[in-house]
Design a protein with these regions (language model features):
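Glycine-rich ThDP/TPP pyrophosphate-binding loop and its adjacent helix/strand module
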Residues: 1-111
Length: 111
């Protein structure tokens, strides 16, 4: 992407620090993630991925940025944010909620 100067490309990473089988740092530490992307020729910025306003502001910033590089937004998120029994619980990577859990989730998410 950087070689081709795809300056209209924006990648968004949902960086919740978990992989399929556990915490990312325990499997393969890739910190600092933004420096990795920069070393690959991308412009990289970070935001609070649980805050829609933060995401929107950072995307608008990237859209206006004068650069020949592709861009990446690293959105720091909490896995399962907003549902107390799902937050930071990697079991939800594999399973679906039952009816009672769906009801409880909807109440907690106010939907």
């Amino acid at each position: 992407s950087s070689k081709l100067k795809l300056n209209n490309l924006i990648a968004i990473i949902d960086y919740n620090k978990y992989q399929a089988t556990g915490k990312s740092d325990e499997i393969l530490n890739i910190k600092p993630l933004s420096k990795k992307w920069i070393s690959f020729g991308w412009d990289a910025i970070e935001c609070n991925g649980n805050d829609h306003n933060s995401i929107s502001k950072k995307i608008n910033f990237l859209l206006k940025k004068k650069s020949n590089k592709p861009k990446v937004l690293i959105a720091h998120t909490i896995k399962g944010k907003g549902v107390d029994f799902m937050e930071n619980d990697n079991n939800w990577h594999y399973r679906s909620p039952n009816i009672d859990e769906v009801k409880k989730s909807k109440i907690q998410l106010d939907i």
